[in-house]
Structure formats: C-alpha cells, structure tokens
Regions:
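Helicase motor core with emphasis on the C-terminal RecA-like subdomain
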Residues: 1-19, 23-34, 39-327, 377-380, ...
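C-terminal helicase lobe
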Residues: 200-203, 222-233, 245-252, 257, ...
Length: 482
C-alpha cells in the first residue's frame, strides 16, 4: 500500500492471494499477477469475477489466440491480469502492457525464481527485465516454502535492493503427520483402503504417476468406495475443471491425483492428505499436505512407504532434465544446419527440439534459458556458429549441478521418512525454524490420537462420480466425442 517492494512467505492456506487482492481493490491501476499454475489462475479469476465482474483476465494456454488478441485490445480495462511467465516472453503482450498503469507486479510461487528452489522455472529468471520494461512497478513476491538462501536469491533475481520481508513459520500445527511402513504394493493398497474407510473426508491421495491415479481409483471403487475420481495433467481441461468443481461442492469425497491437483483448489475443509508415493523433496511435501485443514480444524497427513518406492523419485528427477545423450543429439541436429545458414529463428529451433530431438516443454525451456544466458540465442535467433563443444559441455555440466542438488533434496526427504525424532521438528529445521510448544496431535513419533480423525458423520458417498457421464449431461451427448 505504501509502494514498497515486499517478499512474503506465508504458510499454505493463510491468505497469500489476499495480500494483492485487497491492495488491488483499494488502489488505482492494474495488478499484474505472474503464476506458473494454470489451475490456480483459473480459480483466482473465477473468485475475483464475483467482485470485479469482467475486469479480470488470465493469459495462458487455456485461451485461444483470438481470445488473447481481443483481450489485449482492452488491457487497460482490467483490474487484475493473471499471466504465465512464458506468456511474458511475448513482445506483443509486453508492448501492450507498457500502455497500462501497472500499480502492483505480483510474483506468485516466487521460489520458482531460484535455481536452488524445488520448482525452478527458467522463465521466472527473466522477470526482472519484464519489470523494468513495464515501468518498474511495486513488486510483491509470494511463496509458502523457501529457505533463507532461496529468499535471498529471489531478492537478487528481481533486483529488489531495499525490499521488506515478511517471513512466517511454515508450520501448520493443526496437521498431524504420520508415516506408515508396508512391505509390498498389495499391503500398501490395503493400507490406503483402510485409511480411506476410517478417516473423515474430504481427502486427497497423491501419486507420482498418472497410471497410478487411475489404477487406485479403480481399486477403491472395486472395494465399494464411492464419491472418488482420479485427476492428472493428461486429462482434458474440461474434465479437470469438472472434477475440481465436484470436489469443491462435496459431491466428491476423494480425489486420487498427481501433483497437478490442489494448487487451484482452495477448499478449506479437506481433512486428510495421503501420499501413496513420496515426493522428491520436503518443500513439495509441505506444499501438498498444506492443502488440508485450511479452516484451522484438526487434519492429518499420512505417507505410505514401501521398500519398492525408492526408485520412482529418482526416475522422476532424471526425467525433469535432458540427459547428456539428448543434449549431444540436439547439438548434432543444429550443427547440421550450419552448412545452410548462419542463424535460425527461435521458432525453428523449438520445432527441432520438439519434433526431431523429442524434447518435452520442460527440456526446451531449460535449453533455451541457458543458450540465452550464454548469448547463443539473441533477438529470438540462434547463432549456429557459436554452438561449440564447449557450449554443449557447459549445458551438460549445468544439468549435473542441478541433478546433484535434486538428489540432495531427495535424500533429505528420505531421511525425514526414516527419522527417529519429532517429524515436525525435523521439517521445520530444514527451513530454519523450531517447533513452538507441545501439540496434542503432532506426529507418529510424538503422539497422535487417531480417533480424532475418525469418520464422525455419514458422508455423501452414494454419488458414484464419472466425469465422462457428467460431460455427457452438460453437453447433451449420448457418447463422448460425438
């Protein structure tokens, strides 16, 4: 409100969005919110439409090109503009934003800026240039989980010299934490069934793969569990939005999902979180369990662990970055073009990455960011004669550095699972905090009265949800695809 740059770290569910919504409503000008989470953008837009009507818009992949062009013509009429960091690389959008009075520039999930953060996004590193190009508005950087090193990196990356920091403990004392060890996958499935049948819902079960979300949903339905659906990033946008709404309206008591679910679902009465697979780092774990108990009521987070789990997070980490052989293959493809031309448009390089080298979007972002940093990509063109073996080896070395950091974070996660002390204390210590006082329900090492989380009322379990059936009802279709 006073025009000062701020970095704020607040626990999940403690009103981070209110930190920019309230000032945005009280001040003149437009609030520009950068978020990497498409579902969260859509959720925020839906909520704000109740307050500012049609003066809110999200620029992301959910919008068609025509919709984006139409919205750009009236940017100044919007009170809140949500945008992905990738969209801010559009010269056309930046040109239009320069014409708008941006009173507040919000960086949501700001830990994505730091290469040492658990969810580093290269395009976040370019936000300092965007801020300068649109007139250096006041900056608000928000995160729920960041170490002191990451907070420092956020300030430096955004060029915030005299920044005010509001940093609160990441502890959620109303969420008890438990780890349950099993020997086999079958035992784990049975343990999941027992927990789902025992615990008061609504609940969320996290898995590390799309296939497992579908497999477990089918398993639970086969055991008589109703009001359950799966959710993952491979589903169509309409399908995902339907499931979110059914969960929000308590028509679904349980969602079996990947990490794609949750950030866009601001549901206050989620009572339990179960991890069927553990995430690759502690910060992700805190984010995910933080979706329980946002109303302050007692909730529980349970992690199921078997000896067969430990290879999965390693493969997830390795899939996040291009391998040495993939980088070498890409360079060979690009160097072949040197005999035809001196430079390639960025669009053609992107096409080679996706189609010939079989890169995914994450790999392409990584390659593009580092080639831009090294000056190999300039003014949206790749200088082919600069693609030396030295440059290739620097990219490979950067991957190795990133992998070592991720493996270290994974070891911290595994240590927490096996720890022989207070789980809450161990988690807080990773972020430089201490547990304050004793809790009735803390963790399985200290004490948990499990009956506090037992089903206390008949839940709406006769609603056997099927998203295909719901889509048919909405669109009046007899069969999907007609």
């Amino acid at each position: 409100m006073e025009g000062k740059d701020v970095i704020a770290m607040l626990p999940t569910g403690r009103g981070k969005s209110m930190c920019y919504q309230l000032p945005g409503l009280m001040q003149e000008g437009t609030v520009l919110v950068v978020s990497p989470l498409l579902s969260l953008m859509e959720d925020q837009v839906t909520q704000l439409k109740y307050v500012v009507k049609n003066r809110v818009i999200a620029f992301n992949s959910f919008r068609t090109l025509q919709e984006k062009r139409e919205a750009m013509k009236r940017l100044a009429s919007y009170k809140f503009i949500f945008v992905s960091p990738e969209m801010l690389q559009s010269e056309l959008l930046i040109r239009e934003l320069k014409k708008v009075h941006i009173s507040l520039f919000v960086v949501d999930e700001a830990h994505c800026i730091s290469q040492w953060g658990y969810d580093f996004r290269p395009d976040y590193k370019k936000l300092n240039v965007v801020i300068k190009n649109i007139g250096s508005p006041t900056v608000l950087a928000l995160t729920a989980t960041a170490t002191k090193d990451v907070l420092r990196d956020i300030a430096e990356s955004l060029n915030l010299e005299n920044v005010t920091q509001h940093v609160y403990s990441i502890d959620r004392p109303n969420i008890a934490m438990e780890v349950q060890f099993v020997e086999t996958i079958e035992e784990k499935k049975e343990a999941l069934l027992d927990q789902v049948m025992y615990l008061q819902g609504p609940g969320i079960v996290y898995c590390s793969s799309r296939a497992w979300t579908e497999r477990l949903t089918e398993y639970l339905r086969g055991k008589g569990v109703t009001g359950v659906a799966f959710y993952h990033g491979g589903m169509e946008h309409e399908e995902r939005m339907l499931i979110q709404q059914q969960f929000m309206n308590d028509q679904l008591q349980l969602v079996i999902c990947t990490s794609a679910f949750g950030m866009g679902v601001n549901k206050s009465n989620t009572r339990y979180i179960i991890h069927f697979h553990y995430p690759t780092n502690i910060a992700s774990y805190l984010q995910e369990i933080g979706r329980a108990g946002r109303d302050g009521e007692p909730s529980i987070a349970i992690l199921l662990c078997s000896p067969l789990d430990h290879d999965l997070p390693i493969s997830i980490i390795e899939d996040e970055l291009p391998s040495q052989s993939q980088i070498q293959f890409l360079f060979s493809l690009l160097q072949e073009r040197m005999f035809q031309t001196k430079e390639l448009p960025i669009e053609e390089v992107e096409e080679i990455c996706y189609n010939a080298a079989r890169f995914n979007e994450q790999y392409w972002r990584f390659i593009r960011y580092h080639l831009e940093q090294l000056g190999i990509i300039q003014q949206r063109k790749l200088i082919l004669e600069s693609l030396s073996d030295e440059i290739m080896n620097r990219l490979i070395a950067e991957v190795e550095i990133r992998l070592r950091n991720k493996y270290s974070e994974l070891e911290n996660m595994k240590s927490w699972i096996q720890v022989k002390e207070c789980r809450r204390e161990y988690l807080l210590r990773q972020f430089g905090y201490r547990k304050e006082g004793e809790l009735k329900n803390c963790c399985d090492y200290c004490h948990i009265t499990k009956t506090d989380y037992k089903k206390r009322q008949a839940q709406q379990s006769d609603f056997d949800y099927n998203w295909e059936t719901e889509l048919q009802k909405l669109f009046g279709l007899e069969k999907m695809g007609e």
